[in-house]
Amino acid sequence: DKTLPIYLGVLPRNGKGEDIRWFKAPNQNACHVINAFNVGTKIHFDIPVSKGNGLWFFPDVDGSPFSPPDAMAFPTRWTVDYASKSDEFESVKKLSDMGGEFPRIDDRHLSREHRFAWWLVIDLSKPFTASAGRGMNALGYMDYQTGRQTSWWAGEQYHMQEPCFVPRTPTSPEGDGYIVVVVDNVVTNLSQLVILDAQSVDKGPIARIKVPFRLR
């Protein structure tokens, strides 16, 4: 229902039900989460957000058809202030023009402020094999500190599955490691396990493990 606002519930980690705060913002759609952390009483939620319904199997209450352009999600930061007397979001800030989903960070920084993020990108500027459709054909990278953003395109016959970050060593600095992602070839119906340097995804894979069947 596009006429209704969205609501975000915030409950202190050791709080009780009566401690929950509900914040609202104009209608938008969100699904997967990059990360969330607080700085003092302000809580930041980094999340891919789309203008309209991102899930075609949920019908619109007014019968409107599914709109692919409105379903494109972009990394966005929602900020609320738990100490505020207002029930409105403090801010909604778009973080990148690379639209996509299935984000990932260095999991060692979950619930703490993070510097790097990776996500699957739908790169509409690249060619695609008709049978593949407009799938998630690229891997995006963002450095929050420097503002650097880049991506790796898998190729016109490929779709990607959800990525995973692997630290180079248990004590490596944040973001020092590898992105591991399954890439599906829609023509051969086979998969590859692709490994990229997490800080240089634009340089392409450093290894490919070819699987003699399609995963999933």
Each predicted region: which residue ranges?
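Beta-propeller domains
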Residues: 1-216
